[in-house]
C-alpha cells in the first residue's frame, strides 16, 4: 500500500476530520472579539479586528485542509497529489484555495462573496487607520468590520459542519471497519 493511500485510510479511520484541536481556543478568541465590539475603547476594537482576522483565516485554512483530504478520500483508491502551502499563504490566497477546493457547493458562492468583502473591509480599515480623522468614525468602521466578521464566521462554521457530514456519509459508504 502506498504511503499516500495509507495516510488517507488513517485520516478516515482515526476520524481526524472530526478533530478540532483549536476549538476551545477559537471559542475563547471569538468571545474576546465579540466583547471588543461592545467596548467603546478604539484600542479594544482594533484588537477585536485582529482577533477576528486571525480566527477567520485559521478557520478557512482548516476548512481547505479538510476539503483536500475529502477530495483525496472520495477518489480513493486512486491517488492524487494535492499540496498547498497554507502556512505561507496570504488571506487572499487562502480564499483562492477555498474557491478551487471547496467540496460542498451549498453556500459556496455566498461564502466566497463574504470572504472577499471581509478581506476588502479589513484592508480598507487597516490602511485607513491614519486617514480616518474622527476616532468615532473609526469606531463605526471597526464595528461594521466586526459585524461582517461575525456573519462570515457563522457561514464558515456551517460549511465546516457540512464537510464533516460528507465525511460521515463517505465513512458509511466505504465501510471503514475492514481497515480497523
Where are these regions (language model features)?
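Short coil/turn segments at secondary-structure junctions
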Residues: 36, 40-43, 106, 140-143, ...
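N-terminal hydrophobic targeting segments
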Residues: 1-16, 137-140, 144-147, 151
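Short, solvent-exposed, charged loop/turn and helix-capping segments
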Residues: 94-109
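Charge-enriched, short contiguous segments at helix-coil
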Residues: 109-167
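General structural signal for alpha-helix termini and helix-helix connectors
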Residues: 69, 100, 104, 127-131, ...
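Amphipathic alpha-helical interface elements
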Residues: 2-93, 109-120, 127, 163-179
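A general boundary/transition motif marking the beginning of the first structured unit of a protein
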Residues: 44, 48, 82, 86, ...
